[in-house]
């Protein structure tokens, strides 16, 4: 599979540099094509390392839900304990994702992600030794920190791939990483059964099973450290040491990010697409097990089908975002995002009202495609909000996903205030409501859903260089933003790039 940006018609300059890179690159040495089956360094190797590391972290974080019927019996977990554990698994990553964004801006995605992955792996191993509900909640909380590798994944892809294909790269990397949420629904029951067949009791088997995701999480971190590279031109630490890359002012990086209102809207909307996905990962196996009286492995297979849709749904969202951009520019990306996320919310609301097992499975599968595609569409927009504070904006958006999951589980799925069916329906309504602010995102150089570009003829260079003051420009600290502005002309769309703004 190869995705190629239409550089000529979008204003993106593509160059080929066979001596340095296997893929054609732009002025920032970002790849202008995406070759899925290549492992060429640095672009495609970074892609495969990032999605696999994120996949392993997702498997570890959600390894418990498919075994909950056994775990709750062993630890005497109440409905409140299970709800609190689900909330804990996604709440830790709220702070971690914000910090990860800043860490990527300052130290690079390679070191930042590997450090987090290694530091959270012990929580997965320690799950084998817990003896109380409090212990269960704590290990899920600390293991959930690893979900912040999502931010480093998106940052890394945005650093390696040019605008016309960045949506595809982000969507596929995140989608295949999120696939871990579905894969673990299959992996853990199978591992549990294998250990049981070797003679272990069920209360021992589930504990031993947690060493498998912990081991793979650890190995993925070492692979990133050994084989990864932060940027097309090298690693952050080496470029800082040689003077090729100046260290940015952390205060200004954070300030620019949080002052950009667009980042807050992407965080809100992402809270009710990815947040919904995280919530479903936590509740869906138990939901089908209890409501339709299924066997543990059968419920696990059905639940797995939701997460496994990430194999194509989220990548499809990213690819669709790039397609709409080539035809209609940034405005096309925004419209596609809103339509898909709203449709996902409608399907989610319907799911909670269906009492037939067969129809529930069908609606859940269609719903999974839309909600996961909406996640991919979100990160088709995020890379263009800020060049200087990309990590901060990515972190804010990613954290928004976890905040949405925490609030949803706290309000609708903690205790017995709502039935699971009612909670799922209300979650869908919230998703529809939180997609509405997407219409408020406006770029003066490109426009928004309902408005065209500013009458003041603001250019891409005006927008991205506004993040730097005159003193910083005199030191040439803005060069990266200037190059990014040149390649971002593609976001004007096919209808306007033939008549560039002046």
Curated annotation (Swiss-Prot):
Quote the tissue specificity entry: Expressed in roots, shoots and seeds. Expressed in leaves. Expressed in root hair zone of the primary root and the lateral roots, but not in the lateral root tip or in older parts of the roots. Detected mainly in the epidermis and the cortex. Expressed in shoots only in higher-order veins.
Short name of any one Pfam family annotated for the protein = MFS_1
From the record, give the transmembrane residue ranges: 51-71, 87-107, 111-131, 133-153, 172-192, 208-228, 264-284, 300-320, 334-354, 361-381, 393-413, 423-443
What turns on expression?
Down-regulated by nitrate and by imbibition. No induction by growth on low nitrate concentration, but strong induction in mutant with disruption in both NRT2.1 and NRT2.2. However, this overexpression could not restore the nitrate influx. Induced under long-term nitrogen starvation. Strongly up-regulated upon inoculation with the plant growth-promoting rhizobacteria Phyllobacterium.
Q: Please give the GO cellular component terms listed in this UniProt entry.
A: plasma membrane
Keyword field contains Cell membrane: yes
Q: Which InterPro entries match?
A: MFS, MFS_trans_sf, NO3_transporter
What's a single GO MF annotation on this record? nitrate transmembrane transporter activity
Q: Which family does it belong to?
A: Belongs to the major facilitator superfamily. Nitrate/nitrite porter (TC 2.A.1.8) family.
User: What is known about its subunit structure?
Assistant: Oligomeric molecular complex with NRT3.1.
The protein in question is named High affinity nitrate transporter 2.5
